Structure formats: C-alpha cells, structure tokens
Amino acid sequence: RLSVDIEVEFDPGRFPDPKLAEKRVTAIGLKGTDDFDQIFVLKTEGTDKGNNELNDNIKVTFYDLDKEKEMIADAFKIIEEFPFIVTYNGDEFDLPYLYNRAERLGISNDNNPLYMMRDSATLKHGVHIDLYRTLSNRSFQIYAFSQSYTDFSLNSVSKALLGKEKIDYGLDFDKLSLYQTANYCYNDAQLTYELTSFNSDLLMNLLVIIARIGRMPIDDIARMGVSQWIRSLLYYEHRKRNSLIPKREELQKRTEGVMSDAVIKDKKYRGGLVVEPKEGIHFKVVVMDFASLYPSIIK
C-alpha cells in the first residue's frame, strides 16, 4: 500500500477548492511498503532550498516551477503500481485536487489512475482508503480504539494512536523553505501510513476481516457504518438461500394501518425483559447489542 499527501499553494484565509484546482500542487509525499519513501517538491519563486532534515533513505525530487505537470504525472505512475492507496481526507481534498489539477494541466484521462465518484474518490485499478472517514466511524473509534481520540484531525488521531504529531515550524506555509515543505508533506504521509501499520497492521487486518464477514468491498467497509455491514451480510444470506429481498417501500406498505394495542398501562409497547442480575464476577460473558450504550459501559 501507498500513502499519499499533497500540499497546495493558497491565498491567506482561503482554502484551495479541489473542484476548481486553480492553485499549483507544491509537494506530493509518498510513503509505501517495502521501505518506499519519496517526496516530490515544486520549486517556487524566491524560496530557498534550506537544509535537508530528512533521512538519507528518503528520496527528494525537485521540479522546476513550469514542470508541475511532469511532477503529477510521475506521481500517477507510482500510484498505479500499488493496489491500495491510503490518504487522510483524500475523498474530499487530496485525490479530487490531483484529479482536477491533472485535467487542468492537460494530463489525459488514460494517464490518470484516479476515478471520481459522487461522494468519494477511488482508483481505476485499485482501492482507496480514506482514513479520515474510517477513523471517524464510531465503530472503529469506540470499539477498536476505546475512544482514545475525540477529535478526528490527523494530528489528534496520530497523537492518540501513535504518540506522534504533525510538524509545526511556527511559520506560514508560504514562508517555509523547499526542504521544510518536503519534510512537512512527507511527515503527513508517514503518519497516514503508520495509522495502518502500527500494532502489526491492526487497522488493515480489521478492514480485511470485516470485509470478509460483511461480504463488502474493503473501501466500502472503510467508509460505512456497522448497520451497512450487517445489511450487506443479510443480503448475502438471503441470496445464498435464494430468498427475495423486499424493497423498503414494500415493507412500509405492508405495515400501513397496523396498530399495536398497549400491553402496559400508559406505554405503547412492551419493554424488554429485565432479568435480575446475580451479583459477583462473571466470565465468558458475550454481549450482542449493535451500536448501543450498554456494551460501551460494560467495556
């Protein structure tokens, strides 16, 4: 897999619009498996190179100001080599910006590995996992990571799960040297990658296991909640039994006019049966309660 992070020129107080992609891409950070570490940086007018703070194994390539198209094309060639691309908020920014900027610069669609959908970005021949959407999923936040983070920014999540943070030079981004820009961008790509690799690839293993159980593509698992996982599994079981799956409107029509008489005074429906608990310590306890309050308390 390969993590991707980009940096873009911007006017003070205005965030670049990925749909318009009017500003130059100034850096592309790439961190992949098998010790793949590379960063592309666009030279900008009046910006010094500065000092290289990166490790020797990280390859830094500088492009002249008029070579942005070549820089993006080179990044696309690398992206095509990996079956999994990992980003942080890549659905909303990084990949749409690269896609639209490439189109704006005249890179043909045949040479663009990205594919835009209505509310997400993916690859023509691969899987894109947006960790922002994955880690803001309460199923992962609460059950997998014990709510160790409450804010979903890359900095907050990385600090909680990895004990690492984004780089802060204390300068406006347009005041950074080229090597500082490279270090900043690569560090974001590295944090994104390590969120999938820490604790023996815990998150990637979880995604694969849930995809197998829920019979869903792994990129859908990474973006959808537990109710969709269960629905997909039920669809699979229905099809395996050659059973028809009713449409939602058919279910609604079926229940029209159905009324339930109260069985308990002043209540419309009978509540669940409450069993008096036996005091003491209990082992081999199993809880089956989806997205509810009580399993969280028990945990």
Language-model-detected regions and their locations in the chain:
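Residues immediately flanking
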Residues: 4-6, 90, 131, 288-290
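Acidic beta-strand-to-loop metal/phosphate-binding motif
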Residues: 83-91
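Short, glycine-/Ser/Thr-/acidic-enriched flexible segments
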Residues: 7-9, 35, 134, 280, ...
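Active-site-proximal helix-loop-helix substrate-binding element of RNase H-like nuclease domains
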Residues: 37-42, 46-66, 85, 95, ...
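Conserved RNase H-like, two-metal-ion catalytic cores of nucleic-acid enzymes
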Residues: 1-84, 99, 249, 261, ...
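Common nucleic-acid-contacting/processivity interface regions adjacent to the catalytic cores
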Residues: 172-299
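Short active-site loop/helix that positions an aromatic residue
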Residues: 94-104, 291-299
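Structured core elements
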Residues: 3, 86, 128, 274, ...
